[in-house]
Each structure stands twice: as structure tokens, then as C-alpha cells.
Amino acid sequence: MPELPEVESVRRGLEPYVVGRSFAAVEVHHPRANRGQEAPLSALLVGRKIAAVARRGKFMWLEFADEDHSDPARDVLFIHLGMSGQVRIGEVDSPHVRIAAVLDDTTRLSFVDQRTFGYWRLGPWLSMAHIAPDPLETDFDLTAAGRRLRAKRTVVKAALLDQTVLSGVGNIYADEALWAVQISPLKKASALRQRDAVAVISAAADVMRAALAVGGTSFDALYVNVNGESGYFDRSLHVYGRGGQPCERCGEEILKTVLGGRGTHYCPSCQNRGVGRKSAAN
């Protein structure tokens, strides 16, 4: 699933094409791409002017010029990429185009989604108010986020993925952040010292900034930016996807386990803070 750097790459790519433009036509080619919307998407969007492309964590939306942007109940267009969603500029020759839109300057937007977990939905911004701030926001409160992380009774890896603690961190960047600060993903979040909780979140922010600088992480053709280009942060990963390979820091074999249904990669030797070595290897 696209994480913060991948979604932000799409947001930045989309912004110059759509801000100040209005929807001229919208066609939905698959019902799941507009699920939960009672009225036809074309009736809801045609004629509306786009004022901004916004994002929090993994969630992206379009703001409209005819809405009060300070009103939490304002309508926005949520564009959720799901597991494999892409927003592409121009016509795309693919059987997986789920939504096709045309703007008033003839710019075409294609929503391509092979696995159909993504969607476009018009609704109140308030519906995502429970999503926590993300570490790349300018006014992000690192101390408060550290306290939220320590308040969770799960292991720290699961707590990092909780979008009510901080948003935008997924499997890839959680593993990389924990490796960077040498903390085991199996350690209880509630057992972290405040300085360690802050260090983990700071590391997550650092690794996501580095990923964003190279367009995010692409393991296959399912994640590309608006121009169809892949990111290449996968070349810089230290632990994620490296199960069975030697740790770049200590040489120990990287382990892969499953936590909460998610594949988790870590070094049982140098990421041994907070759990015994025997527990870390199980």
C-alpha cells in the first residue's frame, strides 16, 4: 500500500495540473471505485473548481473553491489509492482504468487501480478528523506523538502503524525507522522511554523524507507517480524486504516474522533493545 512518501509524490505531481481547474466530465468505469456514493460522481463534481490538493499521512483529497476551508464539515473529494491505485495525467491504455475525468482545460485524469481497493468519494472532511497528524507536517508535535505512541499497549511496530498515533507510516518505513534506532519491533510501546519514542518517530520522519526525495518506494509497476514513473527508494532499504540477508550494520541474518498480519523485518542482534535475544529471534 502506498505510504506517506508515495502519496505525497502523487499529490505534488497532481497539484500543478488541477489547482484552479474545474471538472468538465467524470466517468466511473467500475462501481467499487465510487463505492459508498449514492449520487453519480459526475453530478457531484462537474463544474466544481479545485482550490488545492491536500494530504495527511496516506490520505489525499481535493479542496473546492466554493467551500469554506476552515469548516471541518466542508465537502472534499477523497482520493484513496488503496493497495494499487494510481492517479495518472492523460489517457492510459489499461483495462484497470476505474475513473476517467476531464478538466476544463482538457487535461485528463485517469484513476488506475488493478486491485480495486482505492476509490474517489465526495464527503465531509470531518470523516477523517480522527487521523493523527503526520511527521512531515510543519506544526507536528513530536513530544505529543511520543506520548501517544507510549500509551499503546501493543508492540511498537503495531503502534507505529496505528493512524490515530501518527499517520503516514506503513510497513516499509516502520521497519526502517526501528532499524535506524536499533529498537526491536517486538518491544512493547508502553515500555519505551519518552526519548526513545521520540527517536523512533524522528527516524520515521527522516526515512520518509529520504524516500520522498527519490519519488518513494516502488517494488513493482503498481506504484508510479502521475507521469507513470517509479520511485527508487527500494535501493536504499536497510532491512525491509531483506529477510535472510546479512544486516548491514552487524552482519547478523535479518529475520522476517509476522506481527498483526504484517511482514516485519528486523535484526535480532543490533535491534535487541527492550527484548531478550531469545525472544527477538522467535
Curated annotation (Swiss-Prot):
Positions annotated to bind DNA: 96, 115, 152
Coiled-coil ranges per UniProt: none
Cofactor(s) named in the record: Zn(2+)
Database matches in Gene3D superfamilies: 1.10.8.50, MutM-like, N-terminal (3.20.190.10)
Biological processes per GO annotation: base-excision repair
UniProt KW DNA damage keyword: yes
Keywords tagged on the record: DNA damage, DNA repair, DNA-binding, Glycosidase, Hydrolase, Lyase, Metal-binding, Multifunctional enzyme, Zinc, Zinc-finger
Keyword Membrane in record: no
Active site: 2 (schiff-base intermediate with dna), 3 (proton donor), 58 (proton donor), 262 (proton donor)
Entry's EC annotation: 3.2.2.23, 4.2.99.18
Free-text comment on the cofactor: Binds 1 zinc ion per subunit.
Catalytic activity: Hydrolysis of DNA containing ring-opened 7-methylguanine residues, releasing 2,6-diamino-4-hydroxy-5-(N-methyl)formamidopyrimidine; 2'-deoxyribonucleotide-(2'-deoxyribose 5'-phosphate)-2'-deoxyribonucleotide-DNA = a 3'-end 2'-deoxyribonucleotide-(2,3-dehydro-2,3-deoxyribose 5'-phosphate)-DNA + a 5'-end 5'-phospho-2'-deoxyribonucleoside-DNA + H(+)
Zinc finger annotations (FPG-type) as residue ranges: 238-272
Entry's Gene Ontology molecular function annotations: 8-oxo-7,8-dihydroguanine DNA N-glycosylase activity; class I DNA-(apurinic or apyrimidinic site) endonuclease activity; damaged DNA binding; zinc ion binding
Pfam families, sorted: Fapy_DNA_glyco, H2TH, zf-FPG_IleRS
Subunit structure: Monomer.
Its biological purpose: Involved in base excision repair of DNA damaged by oxidation or by mutagenic agents. Acts as a DNA glycosylase that recognizes and removes damaged bases. Has a preference for oxidized purines, such as 7,8-dihydro-8-oxoguanine (8-oxoG). Has AP (apurinic/apyrimidinic) lyase activity and introduces nicks in the DNA strand. Cleaves the DNA backbone by beta-delta elimination to generate a single-strand break at the site of the removed base with both 3'- and 5'-phosphates.
HAMAP family per record: Fapy_DNA_glycosyl
Similarity comment: Belongs to the FPG family.
Name the record gives this protein: Formamidopyrimidine-DNA glycosylase
Organism expressing this protein natively: Corynebacterium aurimucosum (strain ATCC 700975 / DSM 44827 / CIP 107346 / CN-1) (Corynebacterium nigricans)
Designated gene of the protein: mutM
